[in-house]
């Protein structure tokens, strides 16, 4: 008779323990219910990128002196710089500048080490295409200024600032 009573006690303790675990899980679920949503509806809502965001590279053709520092500091030797030496003034003249964003790792070394600041990072990150050859941008495509997300009236922008708890 005693083994039956102890088994019944163990069953009761296990039932209480299981109910407590379920209650703890339910309390965690309820604590998450009053939080703001983490996800956004992407094509219609966009997050405002941070100031140091490394997006598409913007290139200013007139500032470039064809020194090829960007090619030397690039970990994958990506920028293609074509230039011609002008013998009468003994300076390089830039003919063509291109970057293939299908290969670029967006490290920002080219922007950081450029002596004339002709390269800069933009907030543009939508570079997807159906053909990978379209990701090879020449100096004309690199010189195009991106449309700011804030200026686009069709998109609702969401400021992503972390909450500071005090």
UniProtKB/Swiss-Prot annotation:
<dbReference type="InterPro" id="IPR004497">
    <property type="entry name" value="NDHI"/>
</dbReference>
<keyword id="KW-0793">Thylakoid</keyword>
<comment type="function">
    <text>NDH shuttles electrons from NAD(P)H:plastoquinone, via FMN and iron-sulfur (Fe-S) centers, to quinones in the photosynthetic chain and possibly in a chloroplast respiratory chain. The immediate electron acceptor for the enzyme in this species is believed to be plastoquinone. Couples the redox reaction to proton translocation, and thus conserves the redox energy in a proton gradient.</text>
</comment>
<dbReference type="GO" id="GO:0048038">
    <property type="term" value="F:quinone binding"/>
</dbReference>
<feature type="binding site">
    <location>
        <position position="104"/>
    </location>
    <ligand>
        <name>[4Fe-4S] cluster 2</name>
    </ligand>
</feature>
<feature type="binding site">
    <location>
        <position position="67"/>
    </location>
    <ligand>
        <name>[4Fe-4S] cluster 1</name>
    </ligand>
</feature>
<dbReference type="InterPro" id="IPR017900">
    <property type="entry name" value="4Fe4S_Fe_S_CS"/>
</dbReference>
<keyword id="KW-0520">NAD</keyword>
<keyword id="KW-0004">4Fe-4S</keyword>
<keyword id="KW-0479">Metal-binding</keyword>
<keyword id="KW-0874">Quinone</keyword>
<feature type="binding site">
    <location>
        <position position="70"/>
    </location>
    <ligand>
        <name>[4Fe-4S] cluster 1</name>
    </ligand>
</feature>
<feature type="binding site">
    <location>
        <position position="64"/>
    </location>
    <ligand>
        <name>[4Fe-4S] cluster 1</name>
    </ligand>
</feature>
<feature type="binding site">
    <location>
        <position position="110"/>
    </location>
    <ligand>
        <name>[4Fe-4S] cluster 2</name>
    </ligand>
</feature>
<feature type="binding site">
    <location>
        <position position="114"/>
    </location>
    <ligand>
        <name>[4Fe-4S] cluster 1</name>
    </ligand>
</feature>
<dbReference type="InterPro" id="IPR010226">
    <property type="entry name" value="NADH_quinone_OxRdtase_chainI"/>
</dbReference>
<keyword id="KW-0521">NADP</keyword>
<feature type="binding site">
    <location>
        <position position="74"/>
    </location>
    <ligand>
        <name>[4Fe-4S] cluster 2</name>
    </ligand>
</feature>
<keyword id="KW-0408">Iron</keyword>
<keyword id="KW-1278">Translocase</keyword>
<dbReference type="Pfam" id="PF13187">
    <property type="entry name" value="Fer4_9"/>
</dbReference>
<comment type="similarity">
    <text>Belongs to the complex I 23 kDa subunit family.</text>
</comment>
<feature type="domain" description="4Fe-4S ferredoxin-type 1">
    <location>
        <begin position="55"/>
        <end position="84"/>
    </location>
</feature>
<feature type="domain" description="4Fe-4S ferredoxin-type 2">
    <location>
        <begin position="95"/>
        <end position="124"/>
    </location>
</feature>
<keyword id="KW-0934">Plastid</keyword>
<feature type="binding site">
    <location>
        <position position="107"/>
    </location>
    <ligand>
        <name>[4Fe-4S] cluster 2</name>
    </ligand>
</feature>
<keyword id="KW-0150">Chloroplast</keyword>
<keyword id="KW-0472">Membrane</keyword>
<comment type="subunit">
    <text>NDH is composed of at least 16 different subunits, 5 of which are encoded in the nucleus.</text>
</comment>
<dbReference type="GO" id="GO:0051539">
    <property type="term" value="F:4 iron, 4 sulfur cluster binding"/>
</dbReference>
<dbReference type="GO" id="GO:0019684">
    <property type="term" value="P:photosynthesis, light reaction"/>
</dbReference>
<dbReference type="GO" id="GO:0005506">
    <property type="term" value="F:iron ion binding"/>
</dbReference>
<dbReference type="InterPro" id="IPR017896">
    <property type="entry name" value="4Fe4S_Fe-S-bd"/>
</dbReference>
<keyword id="KW-0618">Plastoquinone</keyword>
<protein>
    <recommendedName>
        <fullName>NAD(P)H-quinone oxidoreductase subunit I, chloroplastic</fullName>
        <ecNumber>7.1.1.-</ecNumber>
    </recommendedName>
</protein>
<keyword id="KW-0411">Iron-sulfur</keyword>
<keyword id="KW-0677">Repeat</keyword>
<dbReference type="GO" id="GO:0009535">
    <property type="term" value="C:chloroplast thylakoid membrane"/>
</dbReference>
<dbReference type="GO" id="GO:0008137">
    <property type="term" value="F:NADH dehydrogenase (ubiquinone) activity"/>
</dbReference>
